[in-house]
C-alpha cells in the first residue's frame, strides 16, 4: 500500500512541478528519502506507510509549514515565495543578518504585484499575455529592478545576476501556469 501511495504521489509531483517548483522539489526529495530509508531497512513498513501518507496529504493539499499565512490563498504567490526562499537559503548560508522567510515574503508579494499589474491591465486578464514578448520583457525588467534595488542593495543579500535570473524566469514561468 505504501508503494502505491508513494508511486501515485511521485506521479502527481511530476505532473504539478511547473506550478510550484520549489514546493514540489522539496516534497519529491522527502519522498525519495523515505523510499530509500525503507529500502535500506532503516524504517519499518508501518513508518513507511505513515510517512508516504503524510507526504501525499501535504502534496495534495499544497500545504507546507514554511509558507506564511498571508500567502495561503495565493497559489502563484506561494510559488514565488518558494522560489525566492530557495535562492536566499542558498546564497545566505550565514543567515544571521537576514530573516529569509520575511525577505522571501516581501519578494513574493512584490513579484505578485508586478506580474498582476502587467497581466490585469483593466482588472481583466489580458488575452494571450504569455505570447507578448515586449510585455514579458518589461515585466522581467521590473522584477529584476526590485531584486537589485531592494533585496540586493537595501537588504544586502549577495545575489548574482544568475540568481536573479533564476527567480525572475521561474516566477514568470509559474505565472504562465496559474494565469491563463
Residue ranges and their predicted role:
Residues 1-180:
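Catalytic cores and motor modules of nucleic-acid processing enzymes
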Amino acid at each position: 500500500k505504501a508503494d502505491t501511495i508513494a508511486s501515485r504521489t511521485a506521479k502527481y509531483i511530476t505532473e504539478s512541478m511547473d506550478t510550484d517548483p520549489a514546493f514540489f522539489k522539496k516534497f519529491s526529495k522527502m519522498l525519495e528519502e523515505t523510499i530509500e530509508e525503507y529500502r535500506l531497512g532503516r524504517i519499518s513498513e508501518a513508518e513507511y506507510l505513515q510517512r508516504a501518507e503524510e507526504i501525499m496529504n501535504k502534496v495534495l493539499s499544497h500545504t507546507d509549514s514554511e509558507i506564511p499565512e498571508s500567502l495561503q490563498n495565493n497559489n502563484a504567490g506561494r510559488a514565488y515565495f518558494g522560489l525566492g526562499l530557495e535562492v536566499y537559503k542558498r546564497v545566505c548560508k550565514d543567515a544571521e543578518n537576514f530573516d529569509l522567510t520575511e525577505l522571501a515574503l516581501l519578494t513574493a508579494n512584490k513579484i505578485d504585484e508586478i506580474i498582476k499589474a502587467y497581466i490585469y491591465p483593466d482588472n481583466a486578464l489580458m488575452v494571450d499575455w504569455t505570447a507578448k514578448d515586449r510585455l514579458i520583457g518589461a515585466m522581467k525588467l521590473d522584477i529584476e529592478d526590485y531584486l537589485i534595488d531592494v533585496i540586493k542593495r537595501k537588504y544586502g543579500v549577495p545575489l548574482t545576476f544568475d540568481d536573479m535570473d533564476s527567480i525572475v524566469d521561474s516566477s514568470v514561468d509559474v505565472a504562465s501556469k496559474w494565469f491563463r
